[in-house]
Amino acid sequence: VDRHGPRPHIDDRATTPEDFATLHARFNFSIDVAASAENAKLPRFYTIEDDGLAQDWTGERVYCNPPYSSIEPWVEKAHGGGAEFVVLLLPANRTEQGWWQRWVEPFRRAGTLEVEFLPGRMRFLKPGQPVVKPNERPPFGCCLVILRAPHTGVHAPPAQPRLEDVISDIEGKAA
């Protein structure tokens, strides 16, 4: 949970049916691990009461639009949950934050996950709202973070080279 605590007005927003249909046609998800009964996009889903973080994701084709006030546990679980693959829909404007630097960037550099920045700004449904109002978009773009087996069983970021080694390599190539 972020420094402000849970934020239901943000955390309970749902992917629009149109955007989800595009993703589902591409990935054929088997479960939505961060849903509510009102916004679930698949027949199989976990709600906050089910605690998707505590569930076994082994062999699943996971869709996850996590609560944006608590992203890190979901990204960490994606690495260690044993799923066939996990697609996380995340805000693209938080690449400086610790969770991104711990759980996305090192794996992206190592080539063990994909980051796909989505064009424009997605729309999200508020609880009880059947359609998104015109010009109602979040103030940020989104991205997909995609992890595929066998990298969904990795529990720690790959080792980073020591700064001294990088400098030595650069100096050696310049000589």
Mark where each language-model region is.
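Class I S-adenosyl-L-methionine-dependent methyltransferase catalytic core
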Residues: V1-A175
